[in-house]
Each structure stands twice: as structure tokens, then as C-alpha cells.
Amino acid sequence: MILDVREADELKEGKIDGAVNIPLGRLIRKARHGDIDDLKRKKIITYCNSGYRGNIAADELNKQGFDTVTIEGGYSAWKDYGNKKEG
């Protein structure tokens, strides 16, 4: 599962094909309250625009027992490599 942790206004730049948007603050709250525990069965990839928030999200989710990695360099790096995107 690919999680885009950017804010809604950042999505106008596009997003990775198939990614689900949950802004970082909301994602952390949901993880801490057990609202997304069903995702613990999945491998999760997080990203933001530059990688900073994606790393925070991955670290927090890993602390909560999720199997999470981040895309180094975020969406900017993803686009630079010519990968598939929506928008």
C-alpha cells in the first residue's frame, strides 16, 4: 500500500498512481488510536513531496508495529525518475 502523507493542497501536483492520501498528522492520530490496525498486515510505502514527512510517517508507523518504508526524496524524486503518476 502506498500512502501519500502530503496535505490536500499539495495534491494538485499529482500523486503516485494508486496512492491513498492521508495527511501526516491525521495518519499519526489514526495509528496511535488503532484506527488503521488492519493495515498492519500490509507492506506500507510512505511519501511526501521531499521525503521529510514520509520519513516521519514511516518511523511513527514502524513504532506502532507496521511494516513501513519511505520513498527517499519523496514525490519530487519519483517524478524525476519518470515513474507513473496520477494527475
Q: Which residues fall in each region the model found?
A:
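Rhodanese-like catalytic fold shared by cysteine-dependent sulfurtransferases
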Residues: 1, 8-45, 49-87
